[in-house]
């Protein structure tokens, strides 16, 4: 029995108790929850439902809790139910009922934990979206890991997710990039406002391989040649780095396309129809202050050129016209001002501001031997995705970036994350999976098969803890998806791995020597099979491998 199953059972029991006593059963909340008590001796699960309901139905919380506890003790699968404190209900499950989660996991396999929580939602998830002027820096790498994990997580809950990369190939930074390439190709110093690093020299050489006569072209053609070929080469490198990191995108949208084909003009025309566009001082303004922004925004400048927000408006409208009802933007720490701006833009189009969600990621610092690592050997300036992967590998890089809330700055200790020790969180979790895989191989050599027919024998306290943690997985995924917090999956996996290691140290799974196999052995094998499955499912969500051997 999972916590969700118990919550539904508690709700049904409460409805029957209220109806029996002539009280208003409609006062029941739509969703009833149960929690694991902080002190295990208090029971397997606890609920404050009586305290939530008492005032609404005109009774005392402890009295209502007593009625519910009495009714629960008559329900199959409930071993005991007791009232505690001001009206808590502490519940213990019968072993057989608690152990049913093993069967649920084995039957569901890779889909255990999935739900239809977000069924019908069409989600556009835009992340990374780095300028094609250099390799992915370490901050963008965090979004590459977290964004991909969030996409996988939302998919498990029934959402139709499209991962999108907004390709910033419009604006002055692309001109500076082209000028930097030209300078490198000519053997000249990097322009004062240009880009430096060995990657610039490498790309300049590749441009000349593709266009050997480029340096003899007139200035305008020269810049356009280095701009077009250089951007394509840089973006190919970015996509390859992301692919090797385990992050791929469904759609790549060019910012330049927002400024061609009339998309910006179309967006402004739509906004004029809503009355939210006006002219002042020779410029065109969007009335975003009416929708929560701190000031109105210039859309078309007085010189007739579009402001940066013009592309954002066209891009948002493009997403909505493609049918997305939720647009999630994952932006860097310097983009806090975009939250109100993008929500106001949605409202100006007549949409619910909740159509837009903006996640802001904080800084990432790399540490080696207690000292910050600041310089990239490849880029010559900032640290990159490739630097991190070279230092600790893809799995550790992804896990280290995902396991903390995105609104928290993180320090990645390169020595810790590359170590084969229990202090390394990804090693700790992966080792649990490898240990379980080895156990399955050893069982197969003994011709032992996991058996779910005697799960009532799993009555050791370490078995009970492991069973309860397995049952938490669906709710962890629902909560993580609802809050857009994939780090919760990492923390859950660490808890599960710890519970498994403690179980393994206390409960012998396989017979030893001449010992004959028993029903307890095969029941424990089933518990191990379920644990292995849940660890694999969780690692798949965060895009980390589940090794069979370590």
Swiss-Prot record:
This is Arginine--tRNA ligase. It holds the Pfam family DALR_1. GO terms for molecular function: arginine-tRNA ligase activity; ATP binding. The lineage of its organism: Bacteria, Bacillati, Actinomycetota, Actinomycetes, Mycobacteriales. A motif ('HIGH' region) lies at residues 130-140. InterPro entries: aa-tRNA-synth_I_CS (IPR001412), Arg-tRNA-ligase (IPR001278), Arg-tRNA-synth_N (IPR005148), Arg-tRNA-synth_N_sf (IPR036695), ArgRS_core (IPR035684), DALR_anticod-bd (IPR008909), Rossmann-like_a/b/a_fold (IPR014729), tRNAsynth_Ia_anticodon-bd (IPR009080). GO terms for cellular component: cytosol; plasma membrane. It comes from the Bacteria. Belongs to the class-I aminoacyl-tRNA synthetase family. It is found in: Cytoplasm. Its EC number is 6.1.1.19. Monomer. Its main location: cytoplasm. One of its GO terms (biological process) is arginyl-tRNA aminoacylation. Signal peptide: none annotated. Keywords: Aminoacyl-tRNA synthetase, ATP-binding, Cytoplasm, Ligase, Nucleotide-binding, Protein biosynthesis. The keyword Cytoplasm applies. It catalyses: tRNA(Arg) + L-arginine + ATP = L-arginyl-tRNA(Arg) + AMP + diphosphate. It is an enzyme of class 6 (ligase). The keyword Flavoprotein does not apply. The gene is argS.
């Amino acid at each position: 029995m999972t916590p969700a199953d118990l919550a539904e059972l508690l709700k049904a029991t409460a409805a029957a108790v209220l109806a029996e006593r002539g009280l208003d059963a409609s006062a029941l909340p739509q969703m009833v929850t149960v929690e694991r008590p902080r002190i295990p001796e208090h029971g397997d699960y606890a609920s404050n439902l009586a305290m939530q309901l008492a005032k609404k139905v005109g009774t005392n919380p402890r009295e209502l809790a007593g009625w519910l506890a009495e009714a629960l003790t008559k329900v199959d699968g409930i071993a005991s139910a007791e009232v505690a404190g001001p009206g808590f209900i502490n519940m213990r499950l019968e072993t057989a009922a608690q152990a049913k989660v093993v069967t649920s996991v084995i039957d569901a396999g890779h889909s255990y934990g999935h739900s239809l929580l977000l069924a019908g939602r069409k989600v556009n998830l835009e992340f990374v979206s780095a300028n094609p002027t250099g390799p992915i820096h370490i901050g963008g790498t965090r979004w590459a890991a977290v964004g991909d994990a969030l996409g996988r997580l939302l998919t498990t809950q029934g959402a139709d997710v499209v991962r999108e990369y907004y390709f910033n190939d419009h604006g002055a930074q692309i001109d500076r990039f082209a000028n930097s390439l030209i300078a490198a190709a000519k053997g000249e110093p990097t322009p004062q406002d240009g880009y430096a690093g060995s990657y610039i020299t490498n790309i300049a050489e590749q441009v000349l391989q593709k266009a050997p006569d480029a340096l003899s072209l007139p200035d305008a053609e020269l810049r356009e040649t280095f701009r077009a070929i250089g951007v394509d080469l840089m973006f190919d490198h970015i996509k390859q780095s992301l692919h090797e990191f385990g992050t791929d995108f469904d759609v790549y949208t060019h910012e330049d396309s927002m400024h061609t084909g009339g998309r910006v003009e179309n967006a402004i025309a739509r906004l004029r129809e809503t009355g939210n566009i006006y002219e002042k001082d020779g410029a065109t303004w969007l009335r975003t202050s009416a929708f929560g922004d701190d000031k109105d925004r210039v859309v078309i400048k007085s010189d007739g050129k579009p402001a940066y927000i013009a592309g954002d408006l066209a891009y948002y409208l493009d997403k909505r016209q493609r049918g997305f009802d939720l647009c999630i933007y994952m932006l860097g720490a310097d983009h806090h001002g975009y939250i109100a701006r993008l929500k106001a833009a949605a409202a100006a189009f007549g949409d619910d501001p909740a159509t837009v969600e903006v996640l802001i990621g904080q800084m990432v610092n790399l540490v080696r031997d207690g000292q910050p690592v600041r310089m990239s050997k490849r880029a010559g300036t900032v640290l990159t995705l490739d630097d991190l992967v070279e230092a600790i590998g893809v799995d550790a890089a992804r896990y280290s970036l995902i396991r903390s809330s995105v609104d928290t700055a993180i320090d990645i200790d390169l020595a810790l994350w590359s170590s084969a020790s229990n202090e390394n969180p990804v090693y700790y979790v992966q080792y649990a999976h490898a240990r379980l895989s080895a156990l399955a191989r050893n069982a197969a050599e003994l011709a032992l098969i996991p058996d779910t027919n005697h799960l009532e024998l799993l009555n050791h306290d370490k078995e009970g803890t492991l069973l309860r943690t397995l049952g938490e997985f669906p709710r962890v995924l629902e909560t993580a998806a609802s809050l857009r917090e994939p780090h919760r999956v990492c923390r859950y996996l660490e808890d599960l791995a710890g519970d498994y290691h403690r179980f393994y140290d206390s409960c012998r799974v396989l017979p030893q020597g001449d010992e004959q196999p028993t029903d307890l052995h095969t029941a424990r094998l089933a518990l191990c099979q379920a644990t292995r499955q849940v660890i694999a499912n969780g690692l798949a969500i965060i895009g980390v491998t589940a090794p069979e051997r370590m």
